[in-house]
Amino acid sequence: MNIEDFDYHLPESLIAQTPLKNRDQSRLLVLSKDTGELTHLHFRDVIHYFEPGDTLVLNDTRVMPARLFGLKEETGAKVEMLMLTQIEGNDWEVLLKPAKRIKKGHRLNFGDGKIVAECIEELEQGGRIMRLHYEGILQERLDELGDMPLPPYIKERLDDPDRYQTVYAKESGSAAAPTAGLHFTDDLLNKIKQKGVHIAFITLHVGLGTFRPVSVENIDDHEMHSEYYQMTQETADLLNKTKESGKRVISVGTTSTRTLETIRRDHPQFVATSGWTDIFIYPGFEFKAIDGLITNFHLPKSTLVMLVSAFSNKKYILNAYHKAVEMEYRFFSFGDAMLII
């Protein structure tokens, strides 16, 4: 399959730059994955598509305020560091700007020494492995010194950083939000529970690879980035019970989907586990875990458009996207949502 097969025209004016005042007031485009039928609603109406006994799976990762601005100790030159992934202990994979002059052994100073980062390995494309030195708890230092790392297509400043977190965000570790979950409010989740729908949590820490464009023409040649995930025994038991009773597993977001499908690819049923996944889901993939998917609208020619095309089909997805453009839906992280079921 060619990357051009997953392209569509998106006017820049439809890229949402700020979140709506109320999370669940965003629009919802419901797509029947088997027939292609489209229904236009608001997100709060999603509850009408859930049935008692279904399980809704949410990613409880929390975005770190992981963009730091500091100085190179040796020269005082300004430097920006974006923390991506914890490797081990206090060692982190990061992106640096500018990166060229940061070599092994060089040290960076943030917040008058509240965080000091020492380069221990040089990677490609501005990447480095940095060893962090700080007193106390890293999350507290980041809350004090760091900025929220918004996606590259969002140009406006975010007044309230909590709007780039889900209301159930818990496990700190992401460089980007699992944006399908941004539409849920505590009130909506409570109403969903009252309907007899189960809520389950997984964790997948979203890396910046989610924004990296596909650089090959033949998508079979694309190499996916890896992301850390985990599932608890409680969640595994609930999902197995849901499947055994003939009810549906509805995934909130592509991150939850990648976690669930990774586990069911590797095991005959859901199990408590953790690890790294580089699963690449595109048309032809056999889904074993999910029966429904809530997701935002994704970038043209992205692996996420391929994922949703695999769950429904490419023709239905591109038709839905064209209709969403025509009706001026809001796109990407702060945009509107789809329910594919």
Curated annotation (Swiss-Prot):
It comes from the Bacteria. Pfam families: Queuosine_synth. InterPro entries: QueA, QueA_dom1, QueA_dom2, QueA_sf. It is an enzyme of class 2 (transferase). Its main location: cytoplasm. Keywords: Cytoplasm, Queuosine biosynthesis, S-adenosyl-L-methionine, Transferase. GO terms for molecular function: S-adenosylmethionine:tRNA ribosyltransferase-isomerase activity. GO terms for cellular component: cytoplasm. Monomer. Belongs to the QueA family. This is S-adenosylmethionine:tRNA ribosyltransferase-isomerase. It comes from Staphylococcus epidermidis (strain ATCC 35984 / DSM 28319 / BCRC 17069 / CCUG 31568 / BM 3577 / RP62A).
